[in-house]
Amino acid sequence: MNDRQIKIVCSALLHDIGKIVYRSGVKINHSDGGYEFLKNEIGLNDRDILDAVRCHHAVPLSKATLDDDSVAYITYIADNIASAGDRRENENGEPGFAINTPLESVFNLLNNNNQKLYYKPAMLDDSGDFINCPSEQKEEFTSGYYSAVKEKFRNLLTTIDFSKPVEQYVNSLLELIEGLCTYIPSSTSTKEVADISLFDHSKLTAAFAGCIYTYLKANGISDYKTELFKNSEKFYDKKAFMLYSLDISGIQKFIYTINIQGALKTLRARSFYLEIFMEHILDELLDKLELSRANIIYTGGGHCYLIPVSYT
């Protein structure tokens, strides 16, 4: 990826960081809150990223004075597409927001289920000792918890030098947001089902943003304002990306055709080999397609899904 594309992906990953700021008790809308946090507390001075965070919604974007090829327009459209795909209306919900609501299980409504299972407020534990299984106990977030998450973001984001875009920073940022936001709901609207995490929404937005940039570049489109903002309804119908599936056939035969002696060790070794082999294939694909690991939706068991650019 080139420097500009790295900035675009980073902007998309950070576009909703203001939700952490707002839920920690800072009474400012999440767009401005994210902008102020990154600029004043992190010391980030990259105009592209700051504009994208502050103007990723229609109203502030329409009032802002930006270049026609501003990164903010890509973040705006990518956020809209991701939001359309990961939010469902709660039929019994009343208008408003419940900022302390916990993340619900995606299995609550799957296959016509009608369950009420919730994840506890938690960060991913490097030790692996804690497994956050959803339960009927609804443990809500507190402003203190969000303040702790904000503090961790402050400490870790300051270690990334955004003035020198490096592709590895994308992976570091992706891992950081995964660790802190996997169990934080993206939307706390009482009219929506809160079963999509802030991490998954941010990752999906980054995946779309990377594809859209490459699509526009391939088609010689430099006026992002007209293409993505003024004519956004037309762009939604364009095939700028696709869902791609890859499968390594015959893995069961490869794994289980073994001798009895040392069977467990051989099973582990072959499973690990397949996992590394698939990761290598994905890294090669992403490198050729000039995309980031945000575009990987799922990988495991010799199978994967990713979102690449569509050039048709």
Show the residue positions of the predicted features.
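Alpha-helical phosphate/pyrophosphate-handling elements in metalloenzyme active cores
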Residues: 1-7, 20, 33-44, 199-231
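Phosphate/oxyanion-binding active-site loops and adjacent basic polyanion-contact surfaces
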Residues: 30-34, 197-205, 267-278
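Extended, charge-enriched "interface" segments that sit outside catalytic cores
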Residues: 126-191
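Catalytic-site or vestigial catalytic-site microsegments of nucleotide-handling domains
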Residues: 244-253
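Surface-exposed, low-hydrophobicity interaction/linker segments
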Residues: 261-289
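Conserved helix-loop-beta segment at the catalytic/binding core of cyclic-nucleotide signaling proteins
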Residues: 281-305
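Conserved small/polar residues in nucleotide/adenosyl-binding loops
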Residues: 312
